[in-house]
Amino acid sequence: MTETKSGKAVAPAAQDSVAGTLAVCRSSGEEFRVPKTHDMLRSLFDPRLRKSFLELCITLSLVANCAFCYWSWRVMGGEWAMRMYLAQYLAWRLTYNLGIGLILHYQSHYEFLTEFAKRNGLFASGAASKSWLASFCQFEIASKMPREYDMAQYPTEFNVWLLFRQFVDLVLMQDFTTYVLYVLLSFSKSQVTWSLLQHLNWTSCRVYVGTLMLLLNVWVKMDAHRVVKDYAWYWGDFFFLLKDSNLIFDGVFNISPHPMYSIGYMGYYGVSLITGDYRVLLVSILGHFLQFLFLKYVETPHIERIYGPDQPSSIERVDDQIIKNNRNYTRPLMMTYFWFKNFDPLRPTDYFTVGTAAASISAILLNPKKETVFAITLFVKLVTSMVNFFILRRQSTDKWFTKLFLRNGYTQLYSYQMWQFIYNFNLMLSYVTLALQTWIQFQALSQHDYTNVIFGFILVALHIWADGEILNALTEFGWFYGDFFLTNYIQRPKLASHGIYRYLKNPECVLGVAGAWGTVLITDFSVENIILATIWTLSNHIMVTFVESPHVAKVYGNEMLARQSGVGKTLLGFTPIKHFSDWLDKFSGSLIDMLNVSTEGRDQLEDVIAAALQATTRKLSPDSEFEINRDSENNSDGDFSFTIGDSIEISWKLPRELYHDEDWIGLYRVLETGEDRYRTLVSSRDHWCATNTMGYPKSVKAIGAVKEFTKGDTCVQGRVVFDHNLLYFEKGVYEFRYHSTSGHKVLMISPPFKITVPQLDLDTPEALYQSTVKLLEKCHCLNENGRFEHSKNKYLSERTLQKLFRNSTGADISSDYMKRVNYEIREITERIYEMKKILDSLR
């Protein structure tokens, strides 16, 4: 089956026409070669083709109807003629959708036309002399088909289909003719003149847009018939099936779902724009709506029964996995259409969302000013968009949102549920405020153009439909950006390529803003709503370009990101559009690269400075020595590196005339000391020691670091050790500075060295616990019960411990959580192990 009457096109493999194609009857399985047939217009109006009795009658009825229209317009008046042809159109439209619909429904389920023909022997040899109906049917087919056509050689299904085509020709041509005549009668009352069209105004714009829509409608019809031929045009697969045929998506079937029911009715709205008559628009909407009912209750069930559903039933839904593996998970609250779905009376956030919506709508009773409502709507849209952008961007780059909850003791799934609440709340708030803004603006209008209003609501309906299609294709998991938060639940990474995503790569950027632009029409092009619609459009494009697309490439691969939709393939066939698309891709790519600047700039800067200082650091005083004693296990020549908690030993030597008892040695971060090598301008923050035991007798820690001191005749030398009482417990590049007397004049500077974070053992929870205890014991910050105690070492605070865990395991944990577990190291390490396991699975 195709869709000039359906969403899918069917064509025989490697064939341009169904003529000569092998076909098979649906029930009997009888095979035959399909003879050549012609489309509707050629059958009726091409004088070179033979005409059957019914085809002549159809042509004459069309001519007679046009003549009667002219007569009734001249004699009975335009209003009477309009009502007459409106009634005719509705009658033929019901005959189409209800009459043909019932026939096809029963033919699809019971093959009742085929069975009726067989039961009455309509095409049997010799039956013509016994039954006037058989005689007429055989005469009709014989007069229509070429002379060499032998009716008896073809199955009943094919002959019945040929007769069914005649009925379809009558109904479709009269349906089209009466609609066109009704539009022409309405256009006769229009105020559109040629002089008016020569100037740029609303009337000329709608006429030009309407004309363009008409031309596009003609292209849709022609291209659809090119793809599917008359086999699908006349619902051939309700009678017989083509062998070796496949569902195809080509031409117009590649750019729209159900093109003959969607964009195939674009002309209806085109003529409504041209006439500017809202009554024509309402009639067009009614006709289009009836056609959608025909699609839903006749076409779609038959397509799914013959070819299977669009979305494979075997597809594994991540939503079902989540529910199956987590008993405490419930489906999230969703704002669908104008109501809420999945409301859970035991979930407080649902009451908050619904209550906020109700309160916002109730605010209309306060008669707020237009300016106030617009400002609130603009503020809400900007803030909600920025919040969504920030969370998703950070979540994509470093799992920030998940880590935020994990570090505070919550689960990965709970963080996802909180995101669902935030996203749905933001969506609800932006839509509710936009609706209120539109209502206030609409009330303020002195007069209303109902044609604009109706077209506005059509765009709103299109937006609602698109959201429904997106939800059907992505499921709740995709709707809430689940692949940002629960990557470990995705067993087979694959982007949705069915439903609306077969035709549009990012439908939210096109159809997802239709409602916002619909409010522009409803409010008669108010500046406020134009601004809001523009922001809506830009925010959607920014989200897709700078958040979704980079994440898709990361999770699903660049080849999935480069996949073209049906509309994209069609449009990129035009060279100017392809050039513009390539330029836009390069531009957005460069912006994405700017956003992806490494966050490790500080670490890299420290390394660069350390390398430079290795060459420039020297003794600032002659005949002096100031060296860090090397540990052969941890350091090699030219590379000083110590692990957090390791003691560092320094040897120094100074001429006696330069030495003072109050000389001291300080420990500093290289980045904090600045470029002054002769004077230290920053505080040591108590990371210092004396050079002897007499200079600072009241400072126990300062003199406790002195391990050796010798005063000779010509020089003074010593050895000090910086241990847990004086060291930093954060990674970085450091240096020691030897200061004269109690001031900050620098006499000597050590080579720069690194303090690094030890890699804790993450093989098992017990291994992590043991390695953590060993490290903290070395740092002297555990009490007798094995708990972390800040008072044991003032340099190793909660914040420092957090950084230590983050840098050594990649998992962050909050101080609030550590307080909740009373700083129990086993509880903390078990939580870190679980976090690390989850975060690794998300990569």
UniProtKB/Swiss-Prot annotation:
Keyword Kinase (UniProt): no
Lumenal side: 1-52, 105-166, 221-246, 301-348, 393-419, 474-512
Pathway in which the depicted protein is active: Phospholipid metabolism; phosphatidylcholine biosynthesis
Subcellular location: Endoplasmic reticulum membrane
EC numbers, comma separated: 2.1.1.17
Root EC class: transferase
UniProt membrane topology term: Multi-pass membrane protein
Family listed: Belongs to the class VI-like SAM-binding methyltransferase superfamily. CHO2 family.
Protein name as it appears in the record: Phosphatidylethanolamine N-methyltransferase
Source species: Eremothecium gossypii (strain ATCC 10895 / CBS 109.51 / FGSC 9923 / NRRL Y-1056) (Yeast)
